[in-house]
Amino acid sequence: MSAAKLDVGTRAPDFTLTDQDGASVSLSDFAGSKVIIYFYPAAGTPGCTTQACDFRDNINSLKSAGYQVLGVSKDTVADLKKFQGEQGLNFPLLSDLDLAVHNLYGAYGEKNLYGKTVTGVLRSTFVVDEAGDIRLALYNVKATGHVASLRKKLGVDA
């Protein structure tokens, strides 16, 4: 069973999660700002590392365009701290151990994995505007090339 997916134009659900440094981070902390929230299956795995490093390498152009990036996974705070350090990640990584926020955003549910239907994290990205509304809701994205595609959709130059 999959959680309900969010529609463009709806209010982004607020949440509070713990980041890689043990600090509480809420979506409402960024009120009045544009936020990219991306959900990924697991820190340190090949696809997730590719995607995280892609955000890292593009963070300056995204920030110049007014975007804050938040990565969300079901990893522990300790695993996120290790992942951040190993990859030099320059944006907050948030721990959602009980998958509550994944479910709020429809980023957990059934997916095809190597020809089998399994239940797990749906690699997803959301763009929240300054008013707190969903402007983009992208589900089942590919790790490789995703940030370039996202930049293009947002009109952000490299």
Language model features with spans:
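Chalcogenol-based redox active-site neighborhoods
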Residues: 1-158
